[in-house]
Amino acid sequence: MGLLDAAVSRQNVLVTSVDSVLNWARLSSLWPMGFGLACCAIEMMATNASNYDLERFGIFPRSSPRQSDLMIVAGTVTMKMAERVVRLYEQMPEPRYVLSMGSCSNCGGPYWEHGYHVLKGVDRVIPVDVYVPGCPPRPEALIGGLMKIQELIRMEGLGVSRADALKKLAEAESDPQPLIEEARKQKTA
């Protein structure tokens, strides 16, 4: 038993790592910038409406890239628009995340074969963290993608790179048991 154990057990003191506090603050206050380019933008607006209420998850939309930490690319990205997508992405402060919403921004959508003017996926110009499939995806699917971003933030840390966190998230989707056990260990520690 250490010197502080008695003092901590008698009072309401919470002991945790700085890493987990920072991640909790970041995942509890996502500020997405919507980049709506086509019909997926309508579903993105519906997700922000009172029926789904993204603010209950701590997600507050912003219109400036300098105030956001998440870019939601929703819709068809043309070759001319790709330069602007990159410029807005570069204006976002670190750490920044990208969610690709819908078939058009994921892979070119119905224009992938004959659309010479359409980018065949926004991941060709900026790194994408989470893909939300659908044409257009329902608001529930977008909320699911935002939850994946929050899980990614929870897994990141001072010693954990984003690539490692993405790998761990992919493994957790196939077998969630190790992730559940790790969360239990963190709660008891």
Swiss-Prot record:
Organism domain of life: Bacteria
Protein name: NADH-quinone oxidoreductase subunit B
Topology within the bilayer: Peripheral membrane protein
Gene encoding the protein: nuoB
Compartments (UniProt record): Cell inner membrane
Cofactor binding annotation: Binds 1 [4Fe-4S] cluster.
Subunit-level organization: NDH-1 is composed of 14 different subunits. Subunits NuoB, C, D, E, F, and G constitute the peripheral sector of the complex.
GO cellular component terms attached to this protein's record: plasma membrane; respiratory chain complex I
UniProt keyword rRNA processing, yes or no: no
Chief place where the protein resides: membrane
Cofactors that this protein relies on: [4Fe-4S] cluster
One Pfam family here: Oxidored_q6
Originating organism: Chlorobium phaeovibrioides (strain DSM 265 / 1930)
GO biological process: aerobic respiration; electron transport coupled proton transport
Annotated EC: 7.1.1.-
Any one GO molecular-function label of the UniProt entry: NADH dehydrogenase (ubiquinone) activity
Binding site for [4Fe-4S] cluster: 39-40, 104, 135
Keywords in alphabetical order: 4Fe-4S, Cell inner membrane, Cell membrane, Iron, Iron-sulfur, Membrane, Metal-binding, NAD, Quinone, Translocase, Transport
Family membership noted in the UniProt record: Belongs to the complex I 20 kDa subunit family.
Function: NDH-1 shuttles electrons from NADH, via FMN and iron-sulfur (Fe-S) centers, to quinones in the respiratory chain. The immediate electron acceptor for the enzyme in this species is believed to be a menaquinone. Couples the redox reaction to proton translocation (for every two electrons transferred, four hydrogen ions are translocated across the cytoplasmic membrane), and thus conserves the redox energy in a proton gradient.
Catalytic activity: a quinone + NADH + 5 H(+)(in) = a quinol + NAD(+) + 4 H(+)(out)
